[in-house]
Amino acid sequence: MPEEVQTRCVIVGGGPAGMMAGYLLARAGVPVAVLEKHADFNRDFRGDTIHPSTLELMHELGLLDEFLKQPHQEVRELRAVVNGEAVPIADFSKLPTRCKFIAFMPQWDFLNFLSSHAKRFPSFQLHMKTEVVDLLIENDRVVGVRAKTPRGEMDVHADLVIGADGRHSVTHTRAGFKQCEFGVPIDALWMRISKKKDDPEQSFGFFQHGKLLVMLDRGDYWQCGFVIPKGGFEEIKARGLPQFQNEIVSFAGFLHDRVSELDDWSKIKLLTVQINRLRDWCRDGLLCIGDSAHAMSPAGGVGINLAIQDAVATANLLAEKLRNGPVSVDDLRQVQLRREWPTRLIQGMQVFVHQRVVTGRASGNKGSLPFIVRLLKWFPILRQLPARFIGLGPRPEHFRSPTA
């Protein structure tokens, strides 16, 4: 027989959406259990950008000063090398926030920080190595989840299940939710290349006629993302590592003396880029948020921050009611109603960028700079527009959930 556990809310997935929702609900006095299938949060090539909107939330929680003591890099302006010319893209200095920068921080540090603070609330539980495999359903209502643990099976019964288990979500699959898929013509290859002290400062990446190499400063190494045509990885491997290394050097020449570190394809990880969203985020007893509700492209690094905004809206709308008992389907729909149009807007922009600008294929247009990039170069005030879209996003959330 499975072990039986009872709580008010169970959250499937200990990523940014799940951990923030768990923290906020526990802060409001709601008994909550977060179930994470892995033994720790250490994953390579996850979203590591903490945008000004998220930093503002940390300030509102009174956690910002301690949070910024964690190892991180601060980027106050996004710059890119476009067709060989360095150009500014976004200027965060005029944002109406306490922190006018993007913080680059390993996601595991962010999640460890949040979980350590959440554990201070008596109503919070975190179960690691607990993999949810199914929903518990009674009379067409989701009443909990079944999970595998090192001790055996465990049934967690709850008034609300929050699915925050990512784009390969068990919760939305078992619930029978239908997705709207948006074709994206690219995938991305992620890799590490060592960093030297005399390397040029690089905040964004290199763009050449439809192709893109993103470089993120990780202190002693570069985390590099190379955009390729959708499904094109096998063709790239067939051409061989030397040709792939040469292509990387053609974007960032200063890597010529160490690109040989990529001496095996196992050091190069494929990220299949998806943009999709659920038609319905909820049913009786279940709400999906974050990547479980809407998978984002890496473009702009907005996925983690959109997921956190979902979590804040969830706590704002549901915490008070959850403290007193179950919530209705109409209550759950309020979260989708609030968060769906920001999701649609950002996904629409990402689809446009991938279909018209970053395609992973060499473009026939060999002009020096795209017109919109020339405008950003000529008129500095225009750089505030991408800064607001990336740094704050549409409809940024603020805390309104109660405190226990």
Across the structure, where does each feature detected by a protein language model lie?
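Conserved FAD-binding catalytic core of PHBH/FMO-like flavoproteins
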Residues: 130, 141-155, 160-273, 277-282
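Active-site-adjacent segment of FAD-dependent monooxygenases/related oxidoreductases
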Residues: 51-117
